[in-house]
Amino acid sequence: MTDGATVLVDFFYAQPVGHAVEALHHALAVQRADPSRRVSVLLNAATPVELASCCPWLDRAYAVRSPFLEPAPDALAALAHVPRDWDWVLDDPRRHQPVQRESFAGMVDHYAASDAWLRPREGRRPLGYPPPSRSRHEPLRLELPAAARAAAAGRLPGRGGPLVALLPAGSGPAAQYPSARSWGLVLDALREALPGLGVVLVGRRVRDERTSTGMPAADLARLAAHPAVVADVLDVPLLEQLAAVQRCGLLLSPHSGFGMAAMAVGTPWLTLSGGRWFEWWFDHVPFRSVVPDVRRFPAYSQFGAEATVPDGDGGERVPSMVRERVQADLHRVVAAADELLRGAVPYERCLDDYVRDLVAAHGGDASALWSFDDVHREHLPGRLGG
C-alpha cells in the first residue's frame, strides 16, 4: 500500500562530506519503502549539497545557510525558502542528545526555528523511528554526472596496473592523522608488494566554509612527489574527485566521511582506523578497517578527551596515528589492499571481521558500538552465520 506522502528530511548538521551522505541515505530509506513518496532533504549549506544532484529519486534539496557552532539568531529567516507544509518532517536524532546540544549552539537554534516554521500534517519524528516506514540497509549509489566522469578520465593516466586513491587526512587537526612520512612508508610497502600500482592523491586545500584536508600543504606536496603517485586531483570539484575515485580499485584513508562517499560510488574503502571515531556506515561495498591494538595505541575517544603523544616525526599526534603504529600495521594494510584490489573478500565477511575486531578493541563490550541502521548487530561475535 502506498501513501504518496511528502517528506522532508531535516538534517542540519556539521559540514563534513559524510554527514551529507548520511542524510541522503536516510532519505533513500524512506523513499525506497514507498516509491510514491516525494522525499526532499534539508542540509547545512556548508556541506556538499551537490551530492543531492546525484540522487535522481530525490525530489528536492534545500541548502540552509546558518551558523552551526555559534548561535544563529537569524535561523528562522534562513528557512524562508523552505516550504512550510509537509506530510512528515523527519529530523536528525542528534538534535536531542545533550552532548550535541551543549556543543553546537547553531544546531539548537536551527531546530527551534524549524519546529516553528514547518507544519507537518502527520507528524515530526526522529529519523530511524517509524512511522513513516523505511527500508533498512538499502545500498546508496551516487549517480555522478557524465561531465564529472569525463573530466576524471582525462586527469588519470592510461595504464595497466591497479590504481589506489589516497586521502591522507580527514578534516580534523593534523595531529589526528598520520604524517606525510608515515604515509610514505605505507606507499613504499604497497609499491613493493603490488608491482605496477599507481596512487591518485585526493583532497582539498582550500580554506573556506567547507571542510578541507587536515594536512599542511607542504606535506601534501611531499606526498604528491612520492614515486608511487601517478596523479593528483587535489582541489578539483568534489564530484570530479569522486569520479576519479570511482576509477580506482580502492580508497585508502584514515577515518573520513569522504570514505563513505567513495563507497557510495562503488569503490572499496581501506581505512587506517583509529582517532576519535570508528567506522559506522556500511553500504554493500567490500571494505577493510585496520583496527589498531588499542592497548598500545588508544583510540575511539569520540567526544571524550584525546591526548597526543610525541611522534617519531618530530611532532605530536594521537596515539593511534603515530609512526610506530603505522609501522606495526603495515603488513595488515598491504594484505587488505591486495585482497580488495583482487575482489577476494565478500562484503558480509568484511562486516564479520570488522565487527569482531571492533568489539575486541572495546574490551568485548558490544554495547559501546553503533552503526547506521544497526547493521553491526547482525555481525556481533556469537551471531556469525545466523
Go through each PLM region and give its residues.
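Active-site donor-nucleotide binding/catalytic segment of nucleotide-sugar enzymes
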Residues: 8-11, 92-108, 151-218, 275-277, ...
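Hydrophobic anchor at the start of a short beta-strand
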Residues: 36-40, 163, 197-199, 268-270, ...
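Generic beta-sheet signal
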Residues: 42, 64, 92, 202, ...
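Leloir-type glycosyltransferase catalytic cores
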Residues: 120-155, 285-386
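Conserved nucleotide-diphosphate donor binding/catalytic pocket of glycan-assembly enzymes
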Residues: 58-150, 160-169, 173, 276-285, ...
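A structural signal for short coil/turn segments at secondary-structure junctions
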Residues: 34-35, 56, 159, 194, ...
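Active-site and donor-binding regions of nucleotide-sugar-utilizing enzymes
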Residues: 2-119, 240-242, 259
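Donor-binding and catalytic core of enzymes assembling or modifying cell-surface/extracellular glycoconjugates
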Residues: 47, 177-275, 279
